[in-house]
Amino acid sequence: MTIAENSMQRPSLTSLTRKAGAVTALALGLLVSGAYAKIDDSARYEPVAPTIDQARANILIARQLQFTHFRNLGISDELSGDVFDAYLNYLDSQRIYLTQEDIDALSRVKKHLGSALKTGQLQPGFDIYNLVQQRVIERLKFALGLIDNGIEQLDFTADDRIRVDRSEAPWEANQAALDELWTKRIKNAVLAQRLNGADDDAIEETLRRRYEGQLKRAYQARSEDAFQAYMNAFTGMWDPHTSYFSPRTSENFNINMSLSLEGIGAVLQSDNEYTKVVRLVPGGPASKQGQLQPADRIVSVAQGDEKPVNVIGWRLDEVVDLIRGPRNSTVTLEVIPANASDETITRTIAIKRDEVKLEEQSASKDVIELDRNGETYRIGVINIPTFYADFQAMQAGDPNYKS
């Protein structure tokens, strides 16, 4: 069962779907990169808060689960402990951010999550999310501090042991214990790269970029991130295949299932503070227009004749939302060309949006011939890269819908 929301935050129950593996988030194609610019030390995490629309959506989701799901599971405080554990497993599955002290402090909200979810009281779940995000930031800053001090300062003579999979490990007692754990994690990462032949300067640069990227993403947390995580911990109580999709996730899911989208047909990723073009979808509007090129970096996005919006430093999914749009509409991109000598050189590219067919994910067939003992055999081969079904076309009665 998939519980999805449209852009008005009203959830609706769609047909029973089972997710076979992770759903790739295709915007124009969404790929997340680990390359980011150095984080401003003065940056502060802004706690996220639930919205009225999310509270309403929560109530509707609770009703749908109670009255339309095949599993007859009531919503009460008896459910609270399981929701709490599932939520923490989602937010800190390896138990590397929170401490036992944190878990004990959260016990005050743990007991009543069930009744709160039934009535749309989301603040307890958001309090947990904000605490985890704050702990994530603290841990990443600690890691960056170790790297900035120089990895040569780390003691590699100690008889250290580290548990790689910590999903079943006990929570560390306090912040001091977490400091020790994270020091071991950094030392383990350094040793792994040394064994691969990297020198210390390269190792420091790699680790710094890794943790700065994670830190930037932590600062960019949004209310919808917390809501989706919390709702999935909640809906997962009914069965593993009951999921909540936010409007953005629902749209990406439909794109992947229908193998088509309306946009410009460009695969994007984050690169420092920019959104960079990775590749163009063959036959898509951007590919046909011919000006946008791989490795171009997007500076601003404009809709039709409207003023451009500067998108430097934006989250990748938010940039994608600006670039997507209905077919036959025009989006204008200001980009730094891949071959630009410096970042002050930009050009403006207007592209008319259209339907983009993701043919590379479609099933394909081929016939190969094999010679064996003087005989030629023709063998049919069917390649199915992914499972898909265009639900919208199917519901519209199109006899030739893609599936």
Place the predicted regions along the sequence by residue.
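Boundary at the C-terminal end of the N-terminal hydrophobic targeting segment
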Residues: 35-39, 205, 221
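Bacterial N-terminal signal peptides that target proteins for export
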Residues: 5-22
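PDZ/PDZ-like domain segments forming the peptide/carboxylate-binding groove
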Residues: 89-90, 111, 125-141, 145, ...
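Extended, small/polar residue-biased N-terminal targeting/export presequences
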Residues: 75-161, 215-270, 330-332, 341-368
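Acidic/histidine-rich, surface-exposed loop or edge segments in extracytoplasmic proteins
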Residues: 39-47, 58-70, 108-112, 206-213, ...
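Solvent-exposed, polar/charged alpha-helical surfaces in well-ordered, non-transmembrane soluble domains
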Residues: 55-59, 63, 77, 81-89, ...
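Bacterial N-terminal signal peptides
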Residues: 21-31
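Cleft-lining beta-strand/loop regions that shape enzyme active-site pockets
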Residues: 49-50, 63-76, 216-222, 244-261, ...
